[in-house]
């Protein structure tokens, strides 16, 4: 449940988006595209959570990277490795939510994982309480007009970061999504 005045999912969410390129083909999309997709455009993750929460939750933050990692066989890195790579650019005490996007090879596939709410995280700047969403993609495309895009995966995993633990698990609602009766 996300209600209550002490809920950490209410109010401004300070977000650092960290872009990690494990492919290194110089074909990644511009960080500004991620900035717009997460924070600024009409279909942004910020707009989604702001509207869904009746303007009680909103995102503020920055995008960092691309950081190029030479191990092209890797599908991801440990969080501590990511924090070390981006340390020169980020003061980890300034953010309480992290979205790490790994651009990897096609054999790695694309999914996401996340903490459920905030956890204790060790960073080069010290111990913080933060959430971490990790997105694994072999795509350089981040459209926002389809429910099956990387942006919807980011929004989904960020929901877990806020503490949303449930899944519909592909529940078929039939022809009615909301009803007073079980179908």
Question: Where do the protein language model's features map onto the residues?
Answer:
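Active-site-proximal segment of zinc-dependent metalloprotease catalytic domains
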Residues: 1-182
């Amino acid at each position: 449940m996300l209600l209550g005045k002490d809920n950490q999912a209410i109010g401004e969410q300070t977000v650092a988006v960290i872009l990690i390129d494990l492919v290194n083909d110089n074909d990644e999309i511009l960080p500004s595209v991620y900035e717009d997709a997460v924070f600024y455009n009409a279909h942004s993750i910020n707009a989604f959570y702001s509207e869904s929460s009746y303007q009680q939750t909103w995102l503020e933050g920055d995008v960092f990277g691309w950081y190029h990692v030479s191990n092209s066989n890797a599908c991801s890195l440990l969080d501590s490795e990511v924090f070390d790579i981006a340390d020169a650019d980020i003061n980890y005490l300034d953010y309480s939510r992290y979205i790490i996007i790994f651009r990897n090879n096609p054999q790695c596939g694309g999914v996401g994982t996340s903490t459920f709410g905030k956890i204790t995280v060790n960073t080069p700047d010290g111990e913080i309480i933060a959430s971490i969403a990790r997105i694994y993609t072999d795509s350089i495309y981040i459209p926002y007009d389809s429910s099956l895009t990387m942006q919807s995966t980011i929004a989904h995993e960020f929901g877990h970061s806020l503490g949303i633990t449930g899944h519909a698990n592909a529940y078929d609602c039939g022809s009615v999504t909301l009803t007073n009766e079980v179908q």
